[in-house]
């Protein structure tokens, strides 16, 4: 089970809802992924205008936990305003904190992310900050009392996969709360690798919505995350420089 604050989930796949070709493909991809947490940018939805079509109209909101994010925020104050807007609309108190500090790389601003997380915790939110793979920042966020840490595998939408597995492994090893790898996942192999490192979950969007067949890719991501977690729990063999015979040699007789 993936436990975040008071919530428990069977699926370890968190799915973003943007950039799908149309609502039908989006819904089918969500269904086959079996994701229980769906994330979306509050700024890209007019959640107060009933005349504007949006994702929430099409979803059985009782079936999913919605994770609004603060994408578009440039500082802590903007992030808090967006989070309060989501809460006022009746959405979940759980919020993904996203404060971008660089428009080219879309990497998060560490100072403003820390500040926004602290402010939202004081407001009673369940806080999931999106961060870089900065080990020290992850520890500071943990000490602050956030409910999960979401380090990026690589820049948002890049599809580069996990470019710094060592840092991610350090973050996971020191964590006493869920670590959800977020951003940069490009393939099922990337998602499986994140889980093999010991991540508690993976959040992805573009890898599915931008695939040639988003529905098949959603299913592939589901299976790869399950396989990666199972492999982590099983425990891989140690790496060795030299070969080790896999067939027993003792107790065998050679018939001439």
Curated annotation (Swiss-Prot):
Predominant location category: cytoplasm
Superkingdom of this protein's organism: Bacteria
Positions annotated as active site in the UniProt record: 96 (schiff-base intermediate with dxp)
Reactions catalysed according to its record: [ThiS sulfur-carrier protein]-C-terminal-Gly-aminoethanethioate + 2-iminoacetate + 1-deoxy-D-xylulose 5-phosphate = [ThiS sulfur-carrier protein]-C-terminal Gly-Gly + 2-[(2R,5Z)-2-carboxy-4-methylthiazol-5(2H)-ylidene]ethyl phosphate + 2 H2O + H(+)
Pfam families referenced in this protein's UniProt entry, alphabetically: ThiG (PF05690)
Localization annotation: Cytoplasm
InterPro entries, sorted: Aldolase_TIM, Thiazole_synthase_ThiG, ThiG
Record carries keyword Transferase: yes
UniProt keywords, alphabetically: Cytoplasm, Schiff base, Thiamine biosynthesis, Transferase
First-level EC class: transferase
Enzyme Commission no: 2.8.1.10
Similarity comment: family membership: Belongs to the ThiG family.
Self-association and partners: Homotetramer. Forms heterodimers with either ThiH or ThiS.
Record protein name field: Thiazole synthase
Taxonomic source organism: Bacillus cereus (strain AH187)
């Amino acid at each position: 089970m993936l436990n975040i604050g008071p919530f428990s989930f069977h699926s370890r796949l968190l799915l973003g809802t943007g950039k799908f070709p149309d609502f039908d493909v989006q819904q089918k991809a969500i269904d086959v992924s079996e994701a229980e947490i769906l994330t979306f940018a509050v700024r890209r939805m007019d959640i107060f205008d009933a005349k504007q079509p949006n994702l929430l109209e099409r979803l059985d909101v009782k079936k999913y936990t919605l994770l609004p994010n603060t994408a578009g925020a440039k500082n802590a104050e903007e992030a808090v305003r967006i989070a309060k807007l989501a809460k006022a609309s009746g959405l979940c108190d759980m919020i993904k904190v996203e404060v971008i500090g660089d428009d080219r790389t879309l990497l998060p601003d560490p100072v403003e992310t820390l500040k926004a997380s602290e402010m939202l915790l004081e407001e009673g939110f369940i806080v999931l900050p999106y961060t870089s793979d900065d080990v020290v920042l992850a520890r500071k966020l943990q000490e602050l009392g956030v409910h999960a840490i979401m380090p990026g595998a690589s820049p948002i939408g890049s599809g580069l996969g996990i470019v710094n597995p060592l840092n991610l492994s350090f973050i996971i090893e020191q964590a006493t709360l869920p670590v959800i790898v977020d951003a940069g996942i490009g393939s099922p192999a990337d998602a499986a690798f994140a889980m093999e490192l010991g991540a508690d979950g993976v959040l992805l969007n573009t890898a599915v919505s931008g695939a040639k067949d988003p529905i098949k890719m959603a299913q592939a991501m589901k299976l790869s995350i399950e396989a990666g977690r199972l492999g982590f729990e099983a425990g891989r063999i140690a790496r060795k420089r030299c070969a080790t015979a896999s067939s027993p040699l003792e107790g065998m007789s050679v018939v001439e």
